[in-house]
């Protein structure tokens, strides 16, 4: 057993007897359970459903675990309770999982982003279950008057082997609730896990496939009105005039008015960013009526002072110019200038990628019911914790009067990190004095969005006469953001290294997109490494392993972000599982490996050209994400990341003309189709006992690099510019 100190206080655990039917209720913060604070026994709040993270044990032995983090398809609503249940030592069949509301008084980091939920919650989740288990054992020891070390548990039952006594958790729950929270608990050895590491089906699975209400668009409250927003058609425009006479006269329309997204510049936080200030709101009884009235609006727009309309051609020109000039030096090892001057060979490559729209299957929406006393909000968001303050400020209500309930999200990919639509819904409800559901159309979502930036990267490598890599140079930038990760591989593996970056200002709103920065850098870096390996006459996997061995044996610098052993491990595993070097004669192979969000993924892509089109036959994946909590869900995430990565690199782009997005719906914004998905995807995990690391984002970036390298083998030409399909 591993002994862990609980250091439990109010923010970590709340223990009390459950009001209805006795039993034990243990509320906890996944993250705060390991922090130091004075221990205090507290009675359970009368409104127990307001507690965020909690564990409730009823008299019948049923265990209810509330999952506090937003569920976005990353399976935390299943995986987090699995961790608690394993340490509690309860039968998974006896566990009921519920989605918790926002409650910043009890919980910390209540968001979905950065592939952090399991990684940061791992220890706290385990301790929550282990603490409850010890309290149940203590209750049994006191009841039976036997030593605690003679008490064991198994699948929700407490045993005293010597006397033959046993009792279910439900029978002991009320007594356990009276016991002081222990200062130390015993965590299981990894070999003793019963639930962690086994495949459990998604707790929402049945509701999803049978169409039960789960998502924000499903939410309904009697008397609820529908709202939609008209915004400027292009970036760099603002509202000049409104003619809403026709719209107001249409059936079912309650009101038409204008709102300002922000009262002042101080409200423009990253989490509630919006592209436009002037928004024209239409409110009515039904979606159809509001949609028709919105179309009837006669709106006139004018340029924002000092803002010029932007075009994709302008973006390309500006990035090419910036990429050709020295940038800000972020890291420099050795003397790269001298190494390049004395090189036997110099390899260069320039890579670009366009703006991308998130295109969540469920467009942005949120419900708000604001009164003079309180505000109730319900809907899909990745950052409920961040938005609470913005909503409070806009409404003039104290934080304790803001209630945010989370629904399951129909996709996020970073788009729902930015909750301006939550603020908009709240402001609209306050204005019309009625409950309102704000709905974005697909066109609204794509033109009123927060986009993946357009990126650019220039690479240069030097080889000596023996084809050893002697210098490496990367200069990366983009529209308002740079994808540079200066301390990642191959930094640390080469004596002479230079990393620079630059950015270009723009009035187009950008933000996080699945695996921010990495979603471009992995493609560019891994494509270039293949080109360098070819110039050196080396196998691409062997070349990478050679560099990683240098990083292990004699690393350059002290700030390298990655673990070279784990990095090499996924390359070796994918080499084995793919049968590298033994591929079918009609298939062309590409490989890539990348580190992000504390995890390592390597891919091999098998491709053929059939009827002039690329057809992906196989994708082999080797993944090191530490302990795999739920293999079935982990495989699903990797498969999804592979398909998503291939689709965006091959087909997707968002272009601009006079500041206006040219792709506004799925008819002209290209996404991967079922027929274009890989025919086979294999997933293999590196087995170790490292605490879990990120998994929602790491599978996404590297497969794009493997795709580019497979395309080269299949077509004989390098693919430097996304989307690749335009050059095939």
Model-derived regions, located:
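Cofactor-binding beta-sheet edge motifs in enzyme active sites
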Residues: 2-26, 35-728
